[in-house]
């Protein structure tokens, strides 16, 4: 589970998220509103929004389009979540059943972490996570 999580506000624009994902090499971003988790935005969601409307547009037009869209329009909501005591097996099953790449870990109403496909694969392979990412 990753505990250093980059979150984004539900009112933020897709252009900002694209920048954060590119610079931070992040593929999943929990979306918050008023301190509460309300959704998850994945790199796949961002690509889907971009490709559906902008297949033949130039970079400037594409950026203008992404800037005009709020995250709430393309995020997955409500998010599928797990608790901090959930097993890796449960996390893997939920990700497979719902065809999602991450699970926010919520303790009460507080976002405590994020379990990704990579975390599950590392567990299966017996690879210890990078301490810098925890």
Predicted segments, located by residue:
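Glycine-rich acetyl-CoA-binding "A-motif" of GNAT/NAT acetyltransferases
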Residues: 37-40, 88, 111-114
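The conserved cystathionine-beta-synthase
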Residues: 8-25, 31-33, 81-99, 106, ...
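Tandem CBS (Bateman) regulatory domains
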Residues: 1-4, 42-80, 92-96, 116-134
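Glycine-centered small-residue hotspots that permit tight backbone geometry or close packing
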Residues: 39, 101-102
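Short active-site-proximal "capping" loops at secondary-structure junctions
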Residues: 36-37, 48
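Short hydrophobic beta-strand motif reused across regulatory alpha/beta modules
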Residues: 27, 32, 40-44, 106, ...
